[in-house]
C-alpha cells in the first residue's frame, strides 16, 4: 500500500481498525452473556478490506 493515502482512504482504514476490536467485558455482563463476541472481527491476513 502506498505511503501517501487520500483522506477518505485514511478515514475508512481508521474506522475498520476501530471496528475490529473485541466487545468490552462490561457489555457481556450487562447483556447477561447474550452478546459474547464481535461478529465483525477481521484478520488482516485472511480477509481483505474493500477500501
From Swiss-Prot:
Query: Pfam families given for it?
Result: Ribosomal_L39 (PF00832)
InterPro entries reported in the protein's UniProt record: Ribosomal_eL39, Ribosomal_eL39_CS, Ribosomal_eL39_dom_sf
The secretion signal range is none
Keyword annotations for this protein, in alphabetical order, are:
Ribonucleoprotein, Ribosomal protein
Q: Which PROSITE patterns match?
A: RIBOSOMAL_L39E
Q: Name one GO biological process term.
A: translation
Give the Gene Ontology MF terms in alphabetical order: structural constituent of ribosome
Q: Does the keyword Ribonucleoprotein apply?
A: yes
Which SUPFAM superfamilies does this UniProt record tie to the protein?
A: Ribosomal protein L39e
GO terms for CC?
cytosolic large ribosomal subunit
User: Its function?
Assistant: Binds specifically to a region in 26S rRNA near the subunit interface.
Q: So what family is this one in?
A: Belongs to the eukaryotic ribosomal protein eL39 family.
- UniProt protein name: Large ribosomal subunit protein eL39
Q: Which organism is it from?
A: Sulfolobus acidocaldarius (strain ATCC 33909 / DSM 639 / JCM 8929 / NBRC 15157 / NCIMB 11770)
Q: What is the lineage of its organism?
A: Archaea, Thermoproteota, Thermoprotei, Sulfolobales, Sulfolobaceae
Amino acid at each position: 500500500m502506498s505511503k501517501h493515502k487520500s483522506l477518505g482512504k485514511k478515514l475508512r482504514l481508521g474506522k475498520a481498525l476501530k471496528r475490529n476490536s473485541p466487545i468490552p467485558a462490561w457489555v457481556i455482563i450487562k447483556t447477561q452473556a447474550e452478546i459474547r463476541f464481535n461478529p465483525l472481527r477481521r484478520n488482516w491476513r485472511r480477509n481483505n478490506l474493500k477500501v
